Amino acid sequence: MRAARMFVKKLARKKLVPHRVKAELFGSLGHTGKGHGSDVAVLVGFEGELPDQIDTDTIPSRLEEIRNSQTINLNKKHKIKFLESDLVFHRKKTLPGHANGMKFSAFDAEGNLIKENIYYSVGGGFVIGENTEQKPIAEMHLELPFDFQTGEQLLEMARSSGKCISSMMLENEKTWRSEQEVVNGLDDIWSTMSACINKGIRTEGVLKGG
């Protein structure tokens, strides 16, 4: 969802309004995409949504509208053509940067390619563009205050530092963002989880994928 939104925002910044867009998912995303809802995420991402802001109750009706009308509301501003064949799952192909790769393409009315970008989903909700780093993603590394590879190492760090595991994880998170941002993010996660639990208790029927 984030990657698709990044693509349409880039189109908007360049003042490009395509006649049609296409999404291709590679590697793990291509192999398990529909089962994990990646197709849904791409479609609503093209419509400008973010995972932490979208009203999930509206998704089924929006998907039905896209399929019935064969159009998508690009970035919530432009109705453009979108066919089911414009969402491609490459189950046996990968992109060079990472196992979870996506390629988004935009075309004009004559079918000419006007913009194309590659993105990688690198875990933890993070998405980077193809040119974010010059070196391969696998080589990217940040120095963490408590860098561990095993549970045994983590416990030894707790003993030697006198810190509990949650305190050490907070210090690691502060490598990327401020402590207040971490706390606010955790509050958002808990609110989402709590709402999901309450919705599950109230709702009847069969859970998708179950």
Feature names for model-found ranges:
Residues M1, T32, E179-V182:
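Short, N-terminal intrinsically disordered low-complexity segments that are rich in Pro/Gly
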Residues M1-A4, G35-G37:
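Conserved phosphate/anionic-ligand binding catalytic regions in large, soluble enzymes, centered on
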Residues R2-L25, D57:
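Non-transmembrane, aqueous-exposed alpha-helical and coiled segments at domain scale
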Residues K22-K163:
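Beta-sandwich/jelly-roll carbohydrate-recognition scaffolds of carbohydrate-active enzymes
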Residues E116-Y120, G162-M169, V183, S194, ...:
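A structural signal for small-residue-enriched, beta-sheet-centric alpha/beta enzyme cores
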Residues A158, E171-W176:
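Extended alpha-helical interaction modules
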Residues W176-G210:
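Accessory "access/gating" subregions that flank catalytic or transport cores
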